[in-house]
UniProtKB/Swiss-Prot annotation:
Belongs to the OSBP family. Ergosterol binds at residue 314. The modification Phosphothreonine is found at residue 377. It is found in: Cytoplasm, Cytosol; Cytoplasm, Perinuclear region; Golgi apparatus membrane; Endoplasmic reticulum membrane. This is Oxysterol-binding protein 1.
């Protein structure tokens, strides 16, 4: 029987759920709308009676009296699992899942919890391996026949399931429907804006009003309890007195029936009164405990905030004392620059009073090495030839076709902001869900920051011309490291893109490549990126940014795989990003570090490169921001060693085998011959007055420059970002709130459409990206967004009719 048919018989409410979960030997028989409900055999009797009471009220006789008795025990799920119970939000047990045409249906252990349905091959497997999970908030549940049902999210996940019996199937379907309703409700209550609402004073006032209302209702319930008992006793006494009077036989019969019904009413009322009394006692007892616990937690939070603030100040004093007592290298985060440069910073050291108001300012002093241009070397890493370097004719053509780009933006205003008042509520939270004013931002979106990975695109141009795959891998590794060079002083936060926001960068004439980014998901925030070059390479990635504030530092973890494909050879490289850490969030000078390892793999040849980003330490004698690496062939033999820093340069050395005592190669790796040293990459100098322009590089300064013909969803057209770039921060904050509210309304509209489609039993397509398609990657087998094409064709025709209105 379909779920809709079952709901029509029993009617809504917990009684129906209890009947479905009844643990008797047979299914409970649902009583008619008029009265008596006869239960099925076994302990299902109690459930059958409760359903009868819910459907039409107690009937005469024992059936009606039973309804006032104790409630049935919580039901147990079929096949040895726990049932949906009263909440219908958790269940586990065995079901048969369709696998393929060879194996057919296979027995699997299913677990329903928190709106997610997961399955395992066995119950023991729950500890370590989940075979699949589907989110019920966006899923459709369809009943096929007495035992079979289907769960599908309209995408790649569809479960064809079979229960052992119709009753067991219905228990699962009911539990799934309830879990789905709860998941959809929770989703509707979540904040779409990417900036989760913090607990404001208005929220606290509303919470206190709610508590007062609840207390008032509990008192009303207590009063009604006493009134029911009082009037019930008076009614019974009046009926008894009426029965003792001498009246005609017909009247006596009627009075007797009324008395019987009054007796049943008294029994039912007494049961309700007892339940109310127990609830009141329990609520009053626990209310006092909860109030004490709440007050205790409030006091603890205040003490924790005060302690943390004090520790942060002490830490800042210790750092200053350490810097004063120790001479650090010029390139450490704590001492960037020389005394000669301090006059150019525009401000001196902040006082202790200013520390707690310190904002995401980048380091104040910076030493720019002389002649820090991007130097090109030959493609042959041994240094013998220069096949890969651009010839003079090509350089001349580039200079002629190069468009004039802007070289400056309005200087950053000096607005003060109490950072601690905001950040103390963010400890341990995902920062993409915390509302932040634009004071924390730089006037670029995350899509534009992602495009900055292409700043040193010529490394891929050189790699595309390499004939040796191991040499090619060295240039790919240098390109990977170069993408972090723009972060060294960039301590401000980019704008969170709106869902559907895009950013294009067309440098086909000047540099031979063009790039497109699109925000394909909002929670979790994810951006897809595709860049293609006429010089023989394609770069694509989908990056999800997760971040956590730990009190003293902020961790930013990019999740996702980056792909680089070279057209001529078919070499396909993949790698992932390392963790970025922002230190001294509360007080002290902010500084950024990169740490972790990157494994770059050539999926065609099996060559690998392992890069290690060494975390900075005040007490280490190592070079700050150090990166080391090795390039190996499929057998594990090391051919090249890489050395450098992620903020300045990368070099490589050809590894020569050392002759062992017995004449053989020792460990197949040897000294790094000085004559084989090749400079793979060196950072370009920052523009003049970069410290006043958010430390933007030459490329970053051009990214938000207005261009004609872009899509209406392009980041350059985002009004709050443009206002911030122009120094109108108050207006930018107001505009940011408007855009977030508009996005929130769009999300609620989609959810309402999904809910209606679910109620109507019609399929609903969830949100899909416009220019990217989510599918399984042929190399990594991961689900990712891959460019579907048509963007540049639409731009040429200026046909943007399919673009959403997000600004």
């Amino acid at each position: 029987m379909a779920a809709t048919e079952l709901r029509g018989v029993v009617g809504p409410g917990p009684a129906a759920i209890a009947a479905l979960g009844g643990g008797g030997a047979g299914p409970p028989v649902v009583g008619g709308g008029g009265g008596r409900g006869d239960a099925g055999p076994g302990s299902g009797a109690a459930s059958g009676t409760v359903v009868a009471a819910a459907a039409g009220g107690p009937g005469p006789g024992a059936g009606g009296v039973a309804a006032a008795g104790p409630a049935p025990a919580p039901p147990t799920g079929g096949s040895g699992g726990s049932g949906a119970g009263g909440s219908g939000s958790a269940r586990e047990g065995w079901l048969f899942k369709w696998t393929n045409y060879i194996k057919g249906y296979q027995r699997r252990w299913f677990v329903l919890s928190n709106g997610l349905l997961s399955y395992y091959r066995s119950k023991a497997e729950m500890r370590h391996t989940c075979r699949g999970t589907i989110n019920l908030a966006t899923a459709n549940i369809t009943v096929e026949d007495s035992c079979n049902f289907i769960i599908s999210n309209g995408g790649a996940q569809t479960y064809h399931l079979k229960a052992s019996s119709e009753v067991e199937r219905q228990r699962w379907v009911t539990a799934l429907e309830l879990a789905k309703a709860k998941a959809v409700k929770m989703l509707a209550e979540s904040d779409e804006s990417g900036d989760e609402e913090s607990v404001s004073q208005t929220d606290k006032t509303e919470l206190q009003n709610t508590l007062r209302t609840l207390s008032s209702k509990v008192e009303d319930l207590s009063t009604c309890n006493d009134l029911i008992a009082k009037h019930g006793t008076a009614l019974q006494r009046s009926l008894s007195e009426l029965e003792s009077l001498k009246l005609p036989a017909e009247s006596n019969e009627k009075i007797k029936q009324v008395n019987e019904r009054a007796t049943l009413f008294r029994i039912t009322s007494n049961a309700m009164i007892n339940a109310c009394r127990d609830f009141l006692m329990l609520a009053q007892t626990h209310s006092k405990k909860w109030q004490k616990s709440l007050q205790y937690e409030r006091d603890q939070r205040i003490r924790l905030e005060e302690t943390l603030e004090q520790l942060a100040k002490q830490h800042n004093h210790l750092e200053r004392a350490f810097r004063g007592a120790t001479v650090l290298p010029a390139n450490t985060p704590g001492n960037v620059g020389s005394g000669k440069d301090q006059c150019c910073s525009g401000k001196g050291d902040m006082s202790d009073e200013d520390d707690e108001n310190e904002f995401f300012d980048a380091p104040e002093i910076i030493t720019m090495p002389e002649n820090l241009g991007h130097k090109r070397t030959g493609s042959n890493i041994s240094g013998a030839s220069s096949d890969i370097s651009l010839d003079e004719q090509y350089k001349h053509q580039l200079e002629e076709t190069k468009k004039e780009k802007r070289t400056r933006i309005p200087y950053k205003p000096n607005y003060s902001l109490n950072l601690w008042s905001i950040m103390k509520n963010c400890i341990g939270k995902e920062l993409s869900k915390i509302p932040m004013p634009v004071n924390f931002n730089e006037p670029l979106s995350m899509l534009q920051r992602l495009t900055e990975d292409l700043e040193y695109h010529e490394l891929l141009d050189r790699a595309a011309k390499c004939e040796n795959s191991l040499e090619q891998l060295c240039y790919v590794a240098a390109f990977t490291v170069s993408s972090y060079s723009t972060t060294v002083f960039r301590t401000s936060k980019p704008f969170n893109p709106l869902l559907g926001e895009t950013f294009e960068l067309d440098r086909l004439e000047e540099n031979g490549y063009r790039s497109l980014c699109e925000q394909v998901s909002h929670h979790p925030p994810a951006a897809a990126h595709h860049a293609e070059s006429k010089n023989g390479w394609t770069l694509r990635q989908e990056i999800k940014i997760t971040s956590k504030f730990r009190g003293k530092y902020l961790s930013i973890m990019p999740l996702g795989t980056i792909h680089c494909i070279f057209h001529a050879t078919g070499h396909h490289y993949t790698w992932k990003k390392v963790t970025t850490t922002v230190h001294n969030i509360i007080v002290g000078k902010l500084w950024i570090d990169q740490s972790g390892e990157i494994d770059i793999v050539n999926h065609k040849t099996g060559d690998k490169c392992n890069l290690k980003f060494v975390p900075y330490s005040y007490f280490s004698r190592d070079v700050a921001r150090k990166v080391t690496g090795e390039v190996t062939d499929p057998s594990g033999k090391v051919h090249f060693a890489l050395l450098g820093t992620w903020d300045e340069k990368m070099e490589c050395f050809k590894v020569q085998p050392v002759i062992g005592e017995n004449g053989g190669d020792a460990r197949q790796r040897g000294h790094e011959a000085e004559e084989s040293r090749v400079m793979l990459w060196k950072r370009n100098p920052l523009p003049k007055n970069a410290e006043n322009m958010y430390y933007f590089s030459e490329l970053a300064l051009t990214l938000n420059a207005w261009e004609s013909g872009t899509a209406p969803t392009d980041s350059r057209l985002r009004p709050d970002q443009r206002l911030m770039e122009n120094g109108r921060w108050d207006e930018a904050n107001a505009e940011k709130q408007r855009l977030e509210e508009k996005q929130r309304l769009s999300r609620k509209k989609r959810e309402a459409e999904a809910m209606k489609a679910t109620e109507d039993g019609t399929p609903y397509d969830p949100y899909k990206a416009l220019w990217f398609e989510r599918k399984k990657d042929p190399v990594t087998k991961e689900l990712t967004h891959i460019y579907r094409g048509e963007y540049w064709e639409c731009k040429e025709k200026q046909d943007w009719s399919s673009c959403p209105d997000i600004f």
